[in-house]
Amino acid sequence: MNSCNPLRIALDLDDTIFDFWGAYKALFPRESDLVEHIITRNVASLRYNKEFWENLSLLEKPNFEPHIYATKRINSKVYTRNCLAKHNLPIRPIYQMYYQHGNKADLIKGKCDVLIDDSISNVQMAINSGLPALLIDRPHNQNGNPLFRICSLDIDEIRFAYELELETLGWN
């Protein structure tokens, strides 16, 4: 990859660049609120909560401009753009998949070269669909298969891991 042909990166939002999990646990601290179907219900109750979505703290700022954002959020894109602007992050197209168990690759394949996500299942589904994907290392995904893992949102690390993934999978 060179600067004449930049890597088109699809970047997940929650727990990739924003601290969704920390904000969620502050609002829903009970152990019973940490079960998947309860999380889905609680997130649905936050759909119109502008303050929640616009005030998520920044986990990590990428040192590149993503081509697109890919998320499974159900809130207004306006809230997302406002949060991006608040943290001086680039405003780029936002692709939202409303079904939590859906495959982001169905939405973004052909619109990017690689997906970066914190979810092992999102990364695995993308790869199984023929879309290169990298797992950003976060505390909640330490027990899973390493897949193609990166430790930071650094463009050089991403390029290296992307090229290694293509070579490993025979996609180059």
Feature locations, PLM:
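Donor nucleotide-activated moiety binding/catalytic core segment of transferases
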Residues: P90-C112
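Short hydrophobic segments within beta-strands
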Residues: D12, Y69-T71, I116, I136
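Anion (oxyanion) recognition and catalysis
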Residues: A85, K109, I127
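Substrate-recognition element of Asp-dependent hydrolases with the DxDx(T/V) motif
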Residues: E54, L59-C83, M97
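Charged phosphate-binding loop/patch that engages nucleotide di/tri-phosphates or the phosphate backbone
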Residues: N2-R8, P139-N172
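Conserved Rossmann-like nucleotide-cofactor binding loop
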Residues: T16, A23, I74, S121, ...
